[in-house]
Amino acid sequence: MSNLLFDEPGPRARRRIRIATVAGTVAVLALLALAVRQFAANGQLDAARWQPYATWPMWRYLLSGLWSTALAAVVSAALAMAAGLALALGRLSRRRWIRLPAAAYVEAVRTIPALLLVYVVLFALPRYGLDLPLFWKLVVPLAVSNAAAFAEIFRAGILSVERGQGEAGLAVGLTPGQTMRMIVLPQAARRVLPSIVSQSVGLLKDTSLGFVVSYAELLYSGKVLATYNGLLIQTYIVVALIYLVVNASLSKLARVLEARRPGVRPPRRRFARV
């Protein structure tokens, strides 16, 4: 199945991709081997330095940070998806006074880093009497930033539904709103579900900006823990592995959902002579 953004690579392009993948893998493995060698030379791999992470109190503290990360990510995602759906419908509206502001919001917010929005909520809003609780100082800017991305995902899903589906709803007497709610949106939601999960992975990583507002998410908890026990490298390696496991699991879920979409077949390995 061809991609909307680029053509499917031919035999030569696939061969170059395989060569680049192998070369990149070898380079990464070489860097990892060099890093392990340096860690070993400086005593960072000594068992005594890793022994604290075999105890429950350490993991209980890190898992508490992971729970705070997950909570912030879930609430941010829920708000961003609700706002994104409203923006997507606004961009598809026939009324200019709705369509233009929605389009302006999406185009503007997509160019603003989430960190800048965090600084706005942290420093600018309190000057005007709006000092949010610590949790919302992280959640609000993440929701505002990701709403634009979810809006484009939902809009693409709505536009991918065949025009005849909406026309059939209108033909049986449904109003445009009922047609969108009962016929178009359910189909669009199923089609964009893998993209929603992928965007949620990025949102989960963005919760690491919580260190700016001193919100006790996973990365901030790791920073506090490393300051307390002096095991800087070990702590951040463990935190990185936790992020790796969680994000890899979500990415796997996105691929599974993509493969189970109606009309989508898993890619087959093809061999061609060059």
Annotate each predicted stretch with a short phrase:
Residues 1-274:
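Transmembrane alpha-helices and adjacent helix-loop boundaries
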